[in-house]
């Protein structure tokens, strides 16, 4: 039996599929990135994962249509939170974002000067809610686990 914190036994609870009301998935970028779910972008070092995500962030920041979308699928400009442990904002991230034509007021970073950020950090939720961010990029995600 799995224990919860403080060694309280976990109680078995089940739900039948017949008791679940199915709902539609909402998409940030159909069929690649759903809203409210973790999406991983995998590739070898140097494949351009960070550059791709910054290009998407730039398009979202302007409300421009994403690749493979219809031209009429542009929407409202969105705020994106970008966190990275591999590149500096001033010499890599912001120049790439600017080169992709992004709106610098809509790309934000959570400062980690005093405390490193982790995946479950309340500052992420606070930033998403306060700035109405629609996309959180953790590059690489493995640096934020723990």
Predicted regions and their residues:
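A short, basic N-terminal segment
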Residues: 1-19
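Conserved inter-motif catalytic segment of the P-loop NTP-binding fold
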Residues: 4-9, 24, 28-30, 45-47, ...
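Residues immediately N-terminal to the Walker A/P-loop in ABC ATPase nucleotide-binding domains
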Residues: 34
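Walker A (P-loop) ATP-phosphate-binding motif of ABC ATPase nucleotide-binding domains
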Residues: 38
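Residues at the beta-strand->loop junction immediately N-terminal to the Walker
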Residues: 42
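Hydrophobic positions on the alpha1 helix immediately C-terminal to the Walker A/P-loop
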Residues: 52, 56
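Post-Walker A helix-loop "phosphate-sensing" segment adjacent to the P-loop in P-loop NTPases
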Residues: 59-77
């Amino acid at each position: 039996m799995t224990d919860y914190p403080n060694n309280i036994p976990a109680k078995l609870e089940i739900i039948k599929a017949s008791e679940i009301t199915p709902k539609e998935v909402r998409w940030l970028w159909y069929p690649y990135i759903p809203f409210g779910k973790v999406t991983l972008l995998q590739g070898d070092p140097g494949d351009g994962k960070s550059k791709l995500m910054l290009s998407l962030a730039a398009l979202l920041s302007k409300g421009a249509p994403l690749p493979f979308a219809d031209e009429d699928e542009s929407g409202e400009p969105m705020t994106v939170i970008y966190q990275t442990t591999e590149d500096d904002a001033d010499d890599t991230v912001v120049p790439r974002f600017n080169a992709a034509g992004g709106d610098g007021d809509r790309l934000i970073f959570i400062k980690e000067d005093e405390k490193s950020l982790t995946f479950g950090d309340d500052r992420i939720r606070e930033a998403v809610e306060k700035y109405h961010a629609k996309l959180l990029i953790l590059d690489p995600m493995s640096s934020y686990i723990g």
